[in-house]
Amino acid sequence: MIDQWKVIISCLTAEHAGQTDKDGKKKILSSLDMLAPKEICTETYMVVDSFPTEVEAYNLTTYLKTLFVRFLISQLAATQHLSKDKFRLVPIQDFTSSSDIDWIKPIEEIDKQLYNKYGLTDSDINFIESMIKPME
């Protein structure tokens, strides 16, 4: 793993004890970053996945920024500590250029692709968008 590109997140959620912002929304992920080959992190961070290419790591980073993914994580994140088991509702994707998702699009467009791929209704989408704060 040391010789690959890594995507890391903080092991703590962005919210203190699950509190929402003034609009009633949550960010969920407090810190999200990529590490180049030969870079490592402390146990303060969790390595979400590692890849042979920077593009795949970047695409995973983009995926984690979507409202779709962060909503799914939030369904299992009852405390402010994030662990790998909080990701079990998150569908695995292909982050290569062969993917059925166009990872080059803006995050809002990727969310729309994911909503369509998984057959979410307008009601589902409105609920997700009312609960999760956009991430840049």
Task: List where the protein language model places each region.
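Polybasic, glycine- and aromatic-enriched phosphate-binding surface used to engage nucleic acids
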Residues: M1-D100, N116, K133-E136
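Amphipathic alpha-helical coiled-coil/heptad-repeat segments
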Residues: I101-E136
